[in-house]
Amino acid sequence: MYLQKTYRAGKTIEIQKLAIRRHPRSARQKRHSPTPEAMAAYNKKLAERELTRLLDENFHGGDLSIVLTYRKGGRPSQEQAKDYRSKFLRSCRDYFHARGEKLRYVETTAYGERGAIHHHLVISGIDYRDLQAMWPHGRVIATPLDDTGNYWRLAHYFVNQLRASPATGEEIKGRRWNPSKGLRRPPPKTEVREARTWREEPKPIKGYYIDPDSIESGICPLTGEPYQFYRMVMLIPGRQGKERMRRNQ
């Protein structure tokens, strides 16, 4: 018997399966106790999955992944950077509001390997020249999202950004990322399956393929029970194998 959670987010479907113990542990069986390192890795994985669903549900081809940098001679303190970022987002909101649209974004602030603070965002599609005009502090590096709707690699990139300065050790406080208000958060469909186990190699439903890099099987550090995870992605008509597996960098 196992618990299955299904999340539908945009063009993707996430499947999470977790074995359920039929009988309580006996007095002789040890209670599972994960190490702090295992729990930290597990929590980071959950954060990555949550952000993936948020991106897959709310963004699409033509939206942008951008990096806001600072000129070498004008690198701000953490508080100044926070203020500059807020002013940039206000300008973006005004830009979209004037066009009868609503700004969608997810952002995070991070440090580079050499200690340069910068901002990463996934944002509604906007002309590059307008973006640069709203950011006078340095370069705007913009990359359009592809149309696969499968943005977990972008989520992985966000979650693994440096949160502490290599030079000073100063940490960026708060959440790993900050979303705009009103983004849709896909709810799970939860089912208890009576089968003793699941298929070792999962099969996609009609009209989808399984991203092979998303498949995970192992022991859940929280419960000590087996689990399986994978993500199905909607097939794009006319696309073939490798082309539909393009990756967002």
Put a short name on every predicted segment:
Residues 1-115, 125-249:
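Right-hand nucleic-acid polymerase module
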